[in-house]
Design a protein with these regions (language model features):
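Domain-scale recognition of functional cores that engage charged ligands
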Residues: 1-180
Length: 180
């Protein structure tokens, strides 16, 4: 069952990335009148500064949080897609570590999918998004701060990836370079 869900989620995220890419580039979805222009262009989440930009691998949403529910028939349905600032994975990772320590027999008895490589894969996907012409790149996790509801997530992932956790006030721009 999970293999089918996994394939569907991968397909869904690819479709969402292609949709976003079309909105900011070819705009075929508007020409074909699939989606009204005003619906997108009047959205507070539409960034006209992104028009004409084409991120590497057309990956507008490098991280996606898809909320699934199970209906009364036992079918899984997508409740919502979180593409802007998905959060929650750190709680799952932390929970899995605790569960493995407390109930190791469950992990040997059942085929529990491994999640221990998540932070490494996230780090690698971030590296792959760095433009090739960048000299001496540095990655950070940018957080609004300790009062943000996703702060645990930000600090956990920064620690797991071995990169700095910074707030906007920790950064400054000089001669078109960002410094910490």
């Amino acid at each position: 069952q999970w293999n089918k869900i996994s394939r569907g989620l991968i397909q869904r995220v690819k479709a969402l990335n292609l949709f976003i890419d079309d909105v900011y580039n070819k705009k075929k979805i508007f020409k074909d009148k699939v989606v009204p222009k005003d619906l997108i262009f009047n959205s507070p989440y539409y960034l006209k500064e992104c028009d004409g930009i084409s991120p590497k691998f057309k990956a507008w949403a490098n991280i996606s949080g898809v909320d699934l529910i199970r209906n009364i028939n036992g079918e899984y349905l997508v409740l919502e897609d979180n593409l802007r600032v998905p959060s929650g994975v750190s709680y799952m990772l932390e929970n899995r570590m605790v569960m493995r320590d407390v109930f190791p027999e469950l992990f040997t008895r059942y085929k529990v999918a491994s999640v221990h490589q998540y932070s490494n894969k996230l780090y690698q996907s971030m590296i792959e998004c760095i433009p090739k012409k960048t000299d001496n790149p540095h990655m950070v996790v940018l957080t609004p701060g300790i009062y943000n509801s996703a702060y645990f997530e930000h600090s956990f992932l920064a620690e797991q990836m071995g990169i700095a956790l910074v707030e906007g006030k920790d950064l400054f721009v000089e001669n078109d370079y960002v410094y910490m």
